[in-house]
Amino acid sequence: MPTIGIVAGEASGDLLGSHLIRALKKQRPDLKFVGIAGPKMIAEGAETLFPMERLSVRGYVEVLRHLPGLLKIRKEVAQYFLDHRPDVFIGIDAPDFNFTLERKLKHQGIPTVHYVSPSIWAWRRGKIKKIQQAVSHMLALFPFEPEIYRQAGVAVSYVGHPLADMLPMEPDMEGAREELKLPQDSLVVAMLPGSRQSEVQQLADLYIKTAKLILSERPDARFLVPLITRETRAIFERALYANEGYDLPVSIMFGHAHQAMEAANAVIVASGTATLEAALIKRPMIITYRMPNLSWQILKRMKYLPYVGLPNVLAGRFIVPELLQHDAVPDKLAATLLQMLSDKSQIADIQTEFRRMHELLRQNTEEKAARAVLSFIK
């Protein structure tokens, strides 16, 4: 039975991995998948050696704190694949974990595919040599990435983004509100503080205080907070009580981020894949992020681009506002959101750009990615 080694490190990678496994099994039902998988990949038949949550660490300080455990897991996973050699290994995102693992496997003659280029165009250009040593084939989600790899002599395929295939070109706000039993004429704000516990801890207080300020200006406002785990939900609920927000019209949802954003007039979102989902749902948004100050100082020194949010990177300009770190305060966040919603020409510009983006990224991603992987299997 042909075996594919596969490692994902967080929720967005789990989603990508689950769709890729499904596409591969359509063409080769005999394939076996083993590595580190999240719940969606496991549901598609992947076997996991460790819980994926163990890899979900972000920020330099946080990684240092968890480093011994991460190194131990990586060593054990590498040894497993050397003892049970897969036909090909796929690393999904998680570059700091996967590139070292991929380099070890590639040096032992195991082909390696990396799915999702790291942000070398933003702050990791020095990593291209490490990528050359580690990766047999790169699967790039964004159209500006392949040229960087071709110039460095790395085999690459532009596959587009699976979210662009999954999401309809025109969202249905009215239908989403009917399903969620929300008034059609209310202001609805979706708030997405991230998928990791550390992200939600950093942003929960900010989002709740911002919701209070928005409500003081717009008493008809409703707030939707989709969270994917019990742990992140508990963190947000504790923050609600700590900020005396128990009377706020906030609905905490288990997942259903797409539905929440479709029902919303606007989105407040942590920097990450959810910003792209909001763009593909054509929603005006404010991108936020907070991290421990030391991590922020290190990140600032490494950054090449003036923006961090994927919609702005793809647009090549600040199509939506970013309020990061010390700028991420309730007064600014509430005022910026209300001002944006009052400017119809700004919203029209945002939505036009997001439609263009959607068309560019819609590439039948799963099939293209599967084809590239299967080229390594006899």
UniProtKB/Swiss-Prot annotation:
Protein's UniProt keywords contain Transcription: no
NCBIfam families membership: lpxB
Name listed for the protein in its UniProt record: Lipid-A-disaccharide synthase
Gene Ontology molecular function: any one: lipid-A-disaccharide synthase activity
Catalytic reactions of this protein: a lipid X + a UDP-2-N,3-O-bis[(3R)-3-hydroxyacyl]-alpha-D-glucosamine = a lipid A disaccharide + UDP + H(+)
Pathway assignment: Bacterial outer membrane biogenesis; LPS lipid A biosynthesis
InterPro entries listed in its UniProt record: Glyco_trans_19
GO biological process: lipid A biosynthetic process
Pfam family, any one: LpxB
GO CC terms in record: membrane
